Every structure is written in structure tokens, then in C-alpha cells.
């Protein structure tokens, strides 16, 4: 369990310029959470605080009752896996197999057993046929699936997905969201997804909505995403709009998805 209490953060150490303001939230073990919000809402900064990359000026974070601070940082980080928007910096091996194996370096098994473990992890993300491929030559969606397999190899209790589908084409998004859905069903890990992707968010047990550095709503995804007031305050796209934009981009990949979403959002506001 992760308990966040009265967390405030400023990049300038100025409490009058807070990016996050009095954040209070509890993440229960085995649940899947989606954190939604517009650009600049504070959600990505929050993910870096959860993973120990940033330290808040005020408030505290506890992981299974242990305070996240300088003394406990190494211990807690072993419980947390994080996958970033661009996975290229996470690749350390010449092949997909090497990358997954690197995360298993502390496991003492005979080579045959290790090969089976790696194959099983690759199969979880539908990459078992790519073990001998070089990561840099994979598609964006395939790279993210390899990054997920490498994090799963570490067997963390908590996995943070930081905007992992935002740079992917519709097919890549679909493949990665399918993996997230499979992980969600497992119920053995706490999953926290920082996302703009409605298809990710709707799968969550709970959605947490950020706006202007604070949490403005938390609860059941269907209730949250069907609440017009929350959608407008958070400046996020409704699932209906996202589905239309994804469908149009499949038909014509040259569409600018962000521009398309903006136009569809304006159209929906006029017809609501």
C-alpha cells in the first residue's frame, strides 16, 4: 500500500509556486489506478515523486508503512518498477533477450532454466518471437512491450506507467493497453498509469483526476468519465471523443491526433 499525505512540490523551492498542492491519496495493493489530467496538471511530476526521483517540500509518502526518504530510498525502489514515455533509454542489451536477462542478473539459475524464464516473460507481452531482435529496430509499441517485460523480470510490487502510450500509433496503443488489461486481471501488483489514453483509464479500478496541481476527483472510471463537470475542469477528452479520434487515425494515419481531438472536443461541446 502507498499512502500519500499532504504532499506539496515546487521546482523552485518556492511554496508560492507549487506544482502539486496538498495531495492526499491511498493506493491499495493489487489495484489498477489511472491518473488523468491535462498537460501541466501535475500528474507526471507526481509519478516522479512516487518513484523517489523528486522529493516533496512538504508532506510524506509511505510504502507498506515505510517512509519514502533518503535513508529508505534504495529499499523502497526495489519494490517499484517504472516505464517511461520513451523506453529507448531503458534498453541496455544488444537484443530483446539480453534486455530481459539484465533484469534477472540477481537470479541464480542454470542457463536452460533462465532461458525458459525469459521466454515466459516475453510471452506475457507477446514478444516471444522477437528475442533475437535488436530493440532499436522495433516499433514503438514493441519497444514498450519489451520495457514492460524487463520491469516484470524485476518482480516489483508496484509498477508505474508514465504516459507509455502517448507516442504510439493506434495499433501500438491497442497492443500495450491489452498487456495492461492482462496485468490488471492478475491482481498481484499495484499498477499506476499516468495517461491521456481513455482506453487505459476505463480499465482501471479507480481514476484519479488532476487539475492545476491538485486532485479534483477520484472514483469509479465510468462515473468519473461520464461526469461532464469533471471532464471540463480537467480539460481531458471523453472516451467517446477518444474512440472517434482513434478510428479516424486508423483510416488516415496522417491526421494530427491532438488537433483532431481538439476539434472533436469543440464539436461535442456545441452538441451537448
UniProtKB/Swiss-Prot annotation:
Location of the ABC transporter domain: 2-237
Compartments, record wording: Cell membrane
Organism superkingdom: Bacteria
Matching CDD domains: ABC_cobalt_CbiO_domain1
Entry GO terms, CC: ATP-binding cassette (ABC) transporter complex
Annotated ATP binding sites: 37-44
PROSITE patterns: ABC_TRANSPORTER_1, ABC_TRANSPORTER_2, CBIO
Keyword RNA-binding: no
Function text: ATP-binding (A) component of a common energy-coupling factor (ECF) ABC-transporter complex. Unlike classic ABC transporters this ECF transporter provides the energy necessary to transport a number of different substrates.
UniProt cross-references to NCBIfam families, sorted A to Z: ECF_ATPase_1, PRK13648.1
Record's subunit section: Forms a stable energy-coupling factor (ECF) transporter complex composed of 2 membrane-embedded substrate-binding proteins (S component), 2 ATP-binding proteins (A component) and 2 transmembrane proteins (T component).
Protein name: Energy-coupling factor transporter ATP-binding protein EcfA1
Organism the protein comes from: Mesomycoplasma hyopneumoniae (strain 7448) (Mycoplasma hyopneumoniae)
Amino acid at each position: 500500500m502507498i499512502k500519500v499525505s499532504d504532499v506539496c512540490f515546487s521546482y523552485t523551492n518556492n511554496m508560492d509556486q507549487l506544482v502539486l498542492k496538498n495531495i492526499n491519496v491511498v493506493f491499495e495493493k493489487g489495484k489498477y489506478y489511472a491518473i488523468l489530467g491535462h498537460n501541466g496538471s501535475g500528474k507526471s511530476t507526481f509519478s516522479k515523486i512516487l518513484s523517489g526521483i523528486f522529493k516533496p517540500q512538504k508532506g510524506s509518502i509511505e510504502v507498506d508503512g515505510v517512509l519514502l526518504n533518503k535513508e529508505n530510498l534504495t529499499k523502497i525502489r526495489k519494490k517499484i518498477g517504472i516505464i517511461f514515455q520513451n523506453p529507448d533509454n531503458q534498453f541496455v542489451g544488444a537484443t530483446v533477450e539480453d534486455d530481459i536477462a539484465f533484469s534477472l542478473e540477481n537470479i541464480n539459475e542454470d542457463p536452460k532454466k533462465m532461458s525458459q524464464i525469459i521466454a515466459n516473460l516475453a510471452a506475457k507481452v507477446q514478444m516471444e518471437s522477437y528475442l533475437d531482435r535488436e530493440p532499436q529496430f522495433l516499433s514503438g509499441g514493441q519497444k514498450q512491450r519489451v520495457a514492460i517485460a524487463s520491469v516484470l523480470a524485476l518482480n516489483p510490487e508496484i509498477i508505474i506507467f508514465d504516459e507509455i502510450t502517448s507516442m504510439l500509433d493506434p495499433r501500438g496503443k491497442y497492443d500495450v493497453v491489452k498487456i495492461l488489461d492482462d496485468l490488471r486481471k492478475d491482481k498481484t501488483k499495484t499498477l499506476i498509469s499516468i495517461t491521456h489514453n481513455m482506453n487505459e483509464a476505463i480499465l482501471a479500478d479507480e481514476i484519479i483526476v488532476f487539475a492545476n496541481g491538485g486532485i479534483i476527483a477520484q472514483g469509479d472510471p465510468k462515473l468519473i468519465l461520464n461526469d461532464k463537470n469533471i471532464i471540463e475542469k480537467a480539460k481531458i477528452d471523453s472516451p467517446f471523443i477518444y474512440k472517434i479520434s482513434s478510428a479516424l487515425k486508423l483510416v488516415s494515419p496522417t491526421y494530427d491526433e491532438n488537433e483532431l481531438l481538439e476539434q472533436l472536443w469543440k464539436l461535442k461541446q456545441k452538441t451537448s
